[in-house]
Amino acid sequence: MHEMSLCEGIRGIVEDQARRHGFAAVKVLRLEIGRFAGVEKAALGFAFDVVMRGSAAEGARLEILDLPGRALCYDCGEEAVIEDRFDPCPLCGGGRLMPVGGDEMRIKDMEVQ
């Protein structure tokens, strides 16, 4: 379950930001997770609750914002949203695509007090 180690990284970022900006608690933490990031959201939610115990984010609500997969089509030169890495271009039907988005995971923002 790599979601546990992802949450440990999030905890480190939260603690660093709490020291830098002087907040005591995180009420809401919003994560953007790309379609191809390979993150199991249910496991991430469970790990988040466990790993955040004793930190500024203990008891925080985790909101996950889904980001679409995106690819550049070498046939038509356009960027398009794709559901699967192996889908053809939805604009021209071409099959020569390079994924350019959808594998990211980042903290979008936090509501703190």
Curated annotation (Swiss-Prot):
Pfam family, any one: HypA
Keyword Chaperone applies: no
Keyword Zinc set for record: yes
The encoding gene: hypA
Single annotated GO MF: nickel cation binding
NCBIfam families attached to this UniProt entry: hypA
Residues that span the membrane, as ranges: none
Protein name (Swiss-Prot/TrEMBL): Hydrogenase maturation factor HypA
InterPro entries given in the database record: Hydgase_Ni_incorp_HypA/HybF_CS, HypA/HybF
Keywords, alphabetical: Metal-binding, Nickel, Zinc
UniProt record similarity statement: Belongs to the HypA/HybF family.
Annotated residues for binding of Zn(2+): C73, C76, C89, C92
Stored Gene3D superfamilies: 3.30.2320.80
Native source species: Cereibacter sphaeroides (strain KD131 / KCTC 12085) (Rhodobacter sphaeroides)
Binding, Ni(2+): H2
Role played: Involved in the maturation of [NiFe] hydrogenases. Required for nickel insertion into the metal center of the hydrogenase.
UniProt record, GO biological process: protein maturation; protein modification process
Native organism taxonomy: Bacteria, Pseudomonadati, Pseudomonadota, Alphaproteobacteria, Rhodobacterales
HAMAP family to which the protein is assigned, alphabetical: HypA_HybF
